[in-house]
From Swiss-Prot:
Belongs to the iron-sulfur cluster assembly SufBD family. One of its GO terms (biological process) is iron-sulfur cluster assembly. NCBIfam families: sufB. This is Iron-sulfur cluster assembly SufBD family protein SE_0610. The lineage of its organism: Bacteria, Bacillati, Bacillota, Bacilli, Bacillales. Pfam families: SUFBD_core (PF01458), SufBD_N (PF19295). It comes from the Bacteria.
């Protein structure tokens, strides 16, 4: 019996377009497929060697025995590379019409005109559009799709590529290393501070598609950058796979904020590795919004290498029927007087499952380090579940660690108070949820906060009755 596409009602991003690709690899993962990807991109020999070595690692490494159910993920039924257009365009008018219509629906041109210093749009396996304000280029900022950076900035690229997340890190990092395509490459020179966000948007359009972007950000000494990414996919009856790798290097006194708003359809496996190295007095902020997907497994990681380095993760996860959000954070304290903060907000409804999974590690040299963890979960019905799985490793007796976890339901007292003011039960529940996520949305740029609130309100529709 054929599978039915998931019922997502009026899911805004669930539309899909006709296949307009100019090349599509055969399904399945082989040395020939990996070699074909590298040859089509005209990569140097060292990158092909890296890919093939990663493929061997992928075959050898076991599947994770923890987290969500991956038993239905069939690596032989995935298309690993789809080339949607001949090359990356610098003018929106030159993007192929069918692809442009998709991004018009998603509001990318409007967002670029109003809010952004630079924007990159990836469709399937390749970046189809990329633009950056000229004045940023004059400051020495590099913002390119990752493939272009490999061709045009090979020495800088090679210095940092796979230095934070090696291919052997985990099975899905190995998979990404073998078949990576697209993503963003950012370099901000010493003491250059960029306040206006750079944005990338990742769209899966095809069925049984794998998207494997690789993002690499380097903030040199005293630099700062704010990067925002958004992700969506159509609704299909079969599964797609999104397995990205993000590597960030925060040099001395530098600051990076990395914001993700994902709203995948619930046929997408979202299995992502994100890690940053933070040097002396550097500051790394992860702001992570997880909606949709069949299964998300994502744990942004800060490795605090230099004295006074700071790391923080602020995340929200929303799981509804048939969805598992297995998310959290990792903070690795390797140096004295480092500090970290984790604030995790989770919501589950209609049988959805949310899991906070986190690690805080204090090494032997982490004298005076401190970490604060807050995990709050709101469960909206009796069918939904929540788990909190913290793991703390302490190898230094001169540290401070605080951990607070709270699970709650919408109380009858709260509802009664609001309903006595003439507010319906559904509106009252929505107000309580919006108040619950306010610590997250207030950290977003205004236009993203508005969109996040709209997405949460959409998820809340039909929660009562």
């Amino acid at each position: 019996m054929a599978k039915q596409a998931p019922d997502v009602g009026d899911y805004k991003y669930g539309f899909h377009d006709e296949d307009v690709s100019i090349f599509r690899s055969e399904r399945g993962l082989t040395e020939n497929i990996v070699t074909e990807i590298s040859k089509m991109k005209e990569e140097p020999q060292w990158m092909l060697d890296f890919r093939l070595k990663a493929l061997k690692l992928f075959y050898k490494m076991p599947m994770p025995q923890w987290g969500g159910d991956l038993s239905e993920l069939d690596f032989d039924d995935i298309t690993y590379y789809v080339k949607p257009s001949e090359h990356t365009e610098r003018s929106w008018d030159e993007v192929p019409e069918e692809i442009k219509r998709t991004f018009d629906k998603l509001g990318i041109p409007e967002a670029e005109q109003k809010y952004l210093a630079g924007v990159s749009a990836q469709y399937e396996s390749e970046v189809v559009y990329h633009n950056m304000e000229k004045e940023l280029e004059e400051k020495g900022i590099i913002f390119k799709d990752t493939d272009s950076a490999l061709r045009e900035n090979e020495e800088l690229f090679r210095e940092y590529f796979a230095s934070v997340v090696p291919a052997a890190d985990n099975k899905f990092a190995a998979l990404n290393s073998a078949v990576w395509s697209g993503g963003s490459f950012i370099y901000v020179p010493k003491n250059v501070k960029l306040d206006t966000p750079l944005q990338a948007y990742f769209r899966i359009n095809s069925e049984n598609m794998g998207q494997f972007e690789r993002t690499l950000i380097i903030a040199d000494e005293g630099a700062s950058v704010n990067y925002v990414e958004g992700c969506t996919a159509p609704v299909y009856s079969t599964s797609s796979l999104h397995s990205a790798v993000v590597e960030i290097i925060v040099h001395k006194d530098a600051h990076v904020r990395y914001t993700t708003i994902q709203n995948w359809a619930n046929n997408v496996y979202n299995l992502v590795t994100k890690r940053t190295f933070v040097h002396e007095n550097g500051n790394m902020e992860w702001v992570d919004g997880n909606l949709g997907s069949k299964l998300t497994m994502k744990y942004p990681n800060c490795v605090l290498l230099g004295e006074g380095a700071k790391g923080s993760t602020l995340s929200i996860a929303f799981a509804s029927k048939g969805q598992v959000q297995d998310a959290g954070a990792k903070m690795i304290h390797k140096a004295p007087n480092t500090s970290s903060t984790i604030v995790s907000k989770s919501i589950s409804k209609n049988g959805g499952k949310v899991i906070y999974r986190g690690i805080v590690h204090f090494g032997r040299k982490a004298k005076g380090a401190r970490s604060n963890i807050e995990c709050d979960t709101l469960i909206l019905d009796n069918e939904s579940t929540s788990d909190t799985i913290p793991y703390n490793e302490v190898f230094n007796d001169n540290i401070s660690l605080e951990h607070e976890a709270k699970v709650s339901k919408v109380s009858e007292e709260q509802l009664f108070y609001l309903m006595s003011r003439g507010i319906s039960e559904e509106e009252a529940t929505e107000m309580i949820v919006m108040g619950f996520i306010e610590p997250f949305t207030k950290e977003l740029p205004m236009e993203y906060a508005v969109e996040m609130n709209r997405l949460i309100k959409f998820e809340m529709e039909g929660s009562i009755g």
